[in-house]
From Swiss-Prot:
Keywords: Cytoplasm, Methylation, Protein biosynthesis
GO cellular component terms attached to this protein's record: cytoplasm
Protein location: Cytoplasm
Disulfide bonds: none
Name by which UniProt lists this protein: Peptide chain release factor 2
Originating gene: prfB
Post-translational modification: Methylated by PrmC. Methylation increases the termination efficiency of RF2.
Similarity comment: family membership: Belongs to the prokaryotic/mitochondrial release factor family.
Taxonomy of the source species: Bacteria, Pseudomonadati, Pseudomonadota, Gammaproteobacteria, Alteromonadales
């Protein structure tokens, strides 16, 4: 005789949680809108306006994720109940085992959709930029900044985001002084936004012949790509624009050109640079887009009274505003805000950040 109570209770709980999400995620409104968008995309002249068609396609994907998943949860519960009934009637252990496996898989689908509730911010669904700056500490800090660049690139690639190094500045001996990475894909900003702050590395330095422990700092600053229809008022008189020859430790990630652009916004001290293209005109346009996005994020953080490190606060790259500590000799990486630890330091440096990201998002940082 099979013990059916646990699996039937689990299915009841899945139904209840899915029903809560129905309300929270506006299922009925989204289902109706999905029908409208799908009809519009079937019109023969929709591609006469390519930008609108692309926006509709993106909207449809986002709507389908919610609508189709809730339908999958509801039909999945019915199907699994049918399997349990069949297993009991036929005294079939294999069918009952299959039902338990499918119930576990359905629970994971539900968890993934529940996690979307974390992405309720206005810009969470957007593409994202990530700036990394080395702190004081010379070569050791610059090497640490490059390690962070590699870590965040690996994370993005593992999650299916298109990553592009827009700008990178070589360190004096090794590593990098700073870089800007762009992540293209849904919820890139939502996933990364809690990473803004100072990252502290403690290790025996490979650049110190006596093998002493060194502490280094580097800062990360995350900001969303913003729509062109968001008005950001920038006075051209407030800008200092420099051109320079691109250099970088980005390897295949970055073009070597004579057309790199750096823009400094004098009132805030915000600095952006772009060397991704061989065209100075395109680099300038990208840099202006970066500047608008960065000023938008700085204003949002100011409005939220956020004490995170901002671009005009590089002196804060030290003990005060740390978010995570990477102590390699003790094999311990700890998030100082959530208390989450991971002792597999190599995996984290290879981009395994989800444990930290999920904890910080769930805690509402």
């Amino acid at each position: 005789m099979f013990e059916t109570n646990p699996i039937l209770s689990k299915l009841k709980e899945i139904r209840e949680r899915a029903n809560l999400l129905r309300g929270y995620l506006d299922y009925d409104v989204k289902a109706e809108r999905l029908v409208e968008v799908s009809r519009e995309l079937e019109l023969p002249d929709v591609w006469n306006e390519p930008e609108r068609a692309q926006a509709l396609g993106k909207e449809r994907s986002s709507l389908e994720e919610v609508v189709n998943t809730i339908v999958e949860l509801e039909t999945g519960c019915e199907d699994i109940e049918g399997l349990v009934e069949l297993a009991v009637e036929e005294s079939d252990q294999e069918t009952f085992d299959d039902a338990e496996v499918e119930a576990d898989a359905l629970d994971k689908v539900l968890e993934k959709l529940e996690f979307r509730r974390m992405f309720s911010g206005e810009q969470d669904a957007n593409n994202s930029y990530l700036d990394i700056q080395s702190g004081s500490g010379g070569t050791e800090a610059q090497d640490w900044a490059e390690m962070l660049m590699r870590m965040y690139l690996r994370w993005g690639e593992a999650h299916g985001y298109k990553t592009e190094v827009i700008e990178v500045t070589d360190g004096d001996v090794a590593g990098i002084k700073g870089c800007t990475i762009k992540y293209t894909g849904e919820y890139a900003y939502g996933w990364l936004r809690t990473e803004t702050g100072v990252h502290r590395l403690v290790r025996k330095s490979p650049f110190d012949s006596s093998g002493r422990r060194h502490t280094s700092f580097a800062s990360a600053f995350i900001y969303p790509e913003i729509d062109d229809n968001i008005e950001i008022d920038i006075n051209p008189a407030d800008l200092r624009i420099d051109t320079f020859r691109a250099s970088g430790a980005g390897g295949q990630h970055v073009n070597k050109t004579d057309s790199a652009i750096r823009i400094t916004h004098e009132p805030t001290g915000a600095v952006v640079a772009c060397q991704a293209d061989r065209s100075q005109h395109k680099n300038r346009a990208t840099a202006m887009k970066l500047l608008k996005a960065k000023l938008y994020e700085m204003e949002m953080q100011k409005q939220n009274s956020d004490k995170q490190v901002l671009e005009d606060g590089k002196s804060d790259i030290g003990w005060g505003s740390q978010i995570r500590s990477y102590v390699l000799d003790d094999s311990r990486i700890k998030d100082l805000r959530t208390g989450v630890e991971n002792r597999n330091t190599q995996a984290v440096l290879d981009g395994d950040l989800d444990k930290f990201l999920e904890a910080s998002l769930k805690s509402g940082l």
